[in-house]
Each structure stands twice: as C-alpha cells, then as structure tokens.
Amino acid sequence: MVVGLLGGSFDPPHPGHVHITREALKRFGLDRVWWLVSPGNPLKPRPPAPLARRLAEARRLMRHPRVAVTGLEAEIGTRFTAETLAVLQRRYPGVRFVWLMGADNLAQFHRWERWRAIMESVPVGVLARPGAGLRARTSPAARRYASALLPEAEAARLGRSAAPAWCFVNLPMMDLSSTEIRATGRWRGQAD
C-alpha cells in the first residue's frame, strides 16, 4: 500500500487542501492519503486554533473513501516531520509513504528540521501553488536533489520509487490559503 501524507496546521482547512489531496491521489499512484493535522508548526510565530477544532473542521470538509484525517502527530508525540516519518515507518513497515507538500513549502523546505532526512527517507510529491513555482524549483532543496527529480509525465511512479525521489506537478490551482482566510477573521472569529 502507498500512502501519501499531507501534513500541516490546517488552520483552517479549506477547499484548496481537498483539491490538492484529490490531485495527489490521481497523480502520484497513491492508494490512500492521510492528513496529519499538526498540533503546531515550529516555523510559525503564533499557535494555531485548538487541535480538536481543526480536526473537526477537516473531517467535515474532507470526505473521501481513500482519505483519513488524523491527529497522529499529537497521538505519537512528535513535533517534527522527520520524527513523525520515522515513527510511522516503524509502526507500518509494509506501507510505502510519500510526503506531500505544496510548492510554497518546497521553497522553504531547507528551513525544516532535518529536511535532508525527510528527502532521504520517503519520496516527496510537490503540488504547484499560486506564485510559488519558480521559488520552489530554484530552492536549496530542489537544487540539492535535482538528480532525484522525476519528470512530471512519470509522476505515477513516485509512490513506488526509492528515496530520494521527488516530483513537481502542475495542476489547476485554487487561489486559497489558510493565512488569507485567517486574515479575514472568518476562522479566528468563530467560537471555539
């Protein structure tokens, strides 16, 4: 089984997350996708909304028979993606994991804790995001792992590829971001 992992704050979850999840299922040869709704993001200056609220909203929004919305990082007590991947690989030895991220995250991936360990442990599927394509393709991570890049036409092989392997796919984009939704007050302004 090949499982894509889409981690993030999901603060709030929105239709753009659903869109890239459906695209990842189609493009990367995945059997399932697990959303890893994180307790917090070490790279963000302020804490997210309560985890229970984000999980409930994510489960309301993401309804697909091949997608599970989880709070695994809180359950297993990990803070960084590399730690989470190590635990999941030990816990599920028969599962092939693929890390999923938007191009905006690839652009700053080199700031993540043990980012090279992530690239070396699982294939990485990168999905285009508005305004982030060039920054992502020229990022330190993209340059460091240029030889491991699969052509977009071979994206379906990603789930069966040995790490390091990554693939950047273009897709119809939705110009939505959690940051912009929070800025409008539509998320934080709601009762917890």
From Swiss-Prot:
Function of the protein: Catalyzes the reversible adenylation of nicotinate mononucleotide (NaMN) to nicotinic acid adenine dinucleotide (NaAD).
Q: What is the enzyme's main class?
A: transferase
Disulfide links within the chain: none
- Kindly provide the name given to this protein in its UniProt entry: Probable nicotinate-nucleotide adenylyltransferase
Q: Which GO terms describe its biological process?
A: NAD biosynthetic process
One Pfam match: CTP_transf_like
Q: Which UniProt keywords apply?
A: ATP-binding, NAD, Nucleotide-binding, Nucleotidyltransferase, Pyridine nucleotide biosynthesis, Transferase
Alphabetized InterPro entries for the sequence: Cyt_trans-like, NadD/NMNAT, Rossmann-like_a/b/a_fold
Protein family membership:
Belongs to the NadD family.
Q: Which gene encodes it?
A: nadD
EC number(s) reported in the record: 2.7.7.18
Part of which pathway? Cofactor biosynthesis; NAD(+) biosynthesis; deamido-NAD(+) from nicotinate D-ribonucleotide: step 1/1
Which reactions does this protein catalyse? Answer: nicotinate beta-D-ribonucleotide + ATP + H(+) = deamido-NAD(+) + diphosphate
Q: Name one GO molecular function term.
A: nicotinate-nucleotide adenylyltransferase activity
**SUPFAM superfamilies listed in its UniProt record:** Nucleotidylyl transferase
Q: Show the CDD domains listed in the entry.
A: NMNAT
